[in-house]
From Swiss-Prot:
Cofactor(s) it depends on: FAD
Function: One of at least two accessory proteins for anaerobic nitric oxide (NO) reductase. Reduces the rubredoxin moiety of NO reductase.
Protein name per Swiss-Prot or TrEMBL: Nitric oxide reductase FlRd-NAD(+) reductase
Residues spanning the membrane: none
Superkingdom of this protein's organism: Bacteria
A family per Pfam: Pyr_redox_2
One GO location term (cellular component): cytoplasm
Entry keyword set: Cytoplasm, FAD, Flavoprotein, NAD, Oxidoreductase
Location relative to the cell: Cytoplasm
Length: 377
């Protein structure tokens, strides 16, 4: 009898994979094991929960039981996988073990928390579970410090500001979204955040946190400090690789996989935020959807390589939303920026005047799909 496919994880990547497998095979045994409740929620909604007044439970779209029934699954929620015996093809938890024919790691990524004194006072918003643990503190907080001015930090800063809170955002870089685009392109959003009342502390460093009678004292460089009620770490994600490492798989930033989503072990695959596909970590929805479609075919006996097109990344800052695509972080591009009252189109071209990247905002986001077609893959 077939042991079927075991999937470790229950987030967006795991669910997309299940749906794609079940479109092609209704009966192959599918087992999912995850440390959380396995209820479905839309992770991008976490960037807007405060202004929307949503509680953690409001985010649930489908319970684990409903998911299991709909797709004929064996689910093991609230279960920590402790080990993978790759030779025997066995996954182990403290009280259980599962044989597999094929194993998929969809373990996601965890929020990186800077190593400063008092780091345990920092909150993270990387899952429904994490939000549930701190929703009362965040709802009651009047003064909020967001550490990190990247995509998530910028989204959260705007959301907390829209909810009427006093928001300070701190980052080492000289501009927001510094790892995604140059300052001349991000300046429109940066200006909008400042207009809304977000206090930007750029080229600044958090040095420590300390609980006080009236809140949390954040010590900064240059002998500065501010007092706040909550501190959120938005300094990026780290792929969860510990299990894969213990199983003897090849690890770099993430779990290394090839174009077939196969790890260094022929029977183990990786998908989603934990995977590093041919040297790239792509923690965005579209590449995960496309990867899940390809992996479902390969798990069922096909041999289909993943071919990713040029893809849009959306920055969900409602007062000034942005779409970007291509190699926006490249240092050698020349940016042609067209700004109007209704939005911006910024084109990044190389020495041969070939479009390599673009960023569009507000009403001009409708131009994104035309630009996307002209980007080299």
């Amino acid at each position: 009898m077939s042991n079927g496919i075991v999937i470790i994880g229950s987030g967006f990547a795991a669910r997309q994979l299940v749906k794609n497998i079940r479109k092609q095979d209704a009966t192959i045994p599918l087992t999912l094991i995850a440390a959380d409740s396995m209820d479905e929620y839309n992770k991008p909604d976490l960037s807007h929960v405060i202004s929307q007044g949503q509680r953690a439970d409001d985010l649930t779209r489908q319970t684990a039981g409903e998911f299991a029934e709909q797709f004929n699954l064996h689910l093991f929620p609230h279960t920590w996988v402790t080990d993978i015996d790759a030779e025997a093809r066995v996954v182990k938890s403290q009280n259980n073990q599962w044989q597999y024919d094929k194993l998929v790691l969809a373990t996601g990524a965890s929020a990186f928390v800077p190593s400063v004194p008092g780091r345990e006072l920092m909150l993270t918003l990387n899952s429904q579970q994490e939000y549930r643990a701190c929703e009362t503190q965040l709802r009651d907080a009047r003064r909020v410090l967001i550490v990190g001015g990247g995509l998530i930090g910028s989204e959260l800063a705007m959301d907390f500001c829209r909810a009427g809170k006093m928001v300070t955002l701190i980052d080492n870089a000289a501009s927001i979204l510094a790892s995604l685009m140059p300052p001349e392109v991000s300046s429109r959003l940066q200006h909008r955040l400042t207009e809304m009342g977000v206090h930007l502390l750029l080229k600044s460093q958090l040095q420590g946190l300390e609980k006080t009678d009236s809140g949390i004292l954040a010590t900064l460089d240059r002998q500065r400090s501010i007092e706040v009620d909550a501190v959120i770490a938005a300094t990026g994600l780290r792929p969860e690789t510990a299990l894969a490492r213990r199983a003897g798989l090849t690890i770099n930033r993430g779990v290394c996989v090839d174009s077939y989503l196969q790890t260094s072990n022929a029977d183990i695959y990786a998908l989603g935020d934990c995977a590093e596909i041919n040297g790239q970590v792509l923690p965005f929805l579209q590449p995960i959807q496309l990867s899940a479609m390809v992996l479902a075919k390969n798990l069922l006996g096909n041999n289909t390589p993943l071919k990713l097109p040029a893809m849009l990344v959306k920055i969900k800052t409602p007062e000034l939303p942005l779409h970007l695509a291509g190699e926006t972080q490249r240092q050698d591009l020349r940016w042609q920026i067209n700004t109007e009252s209704q939005g911006m189109v910024a084109r990044g071209v190389d020495d041969a005047d070939q479009l390599r990247a673009f960023v569009v905002s507000e009403d001009r986001m409708k131009e994104a799909f035309g630009l996307l077609k002209t980007l080299p893959v």
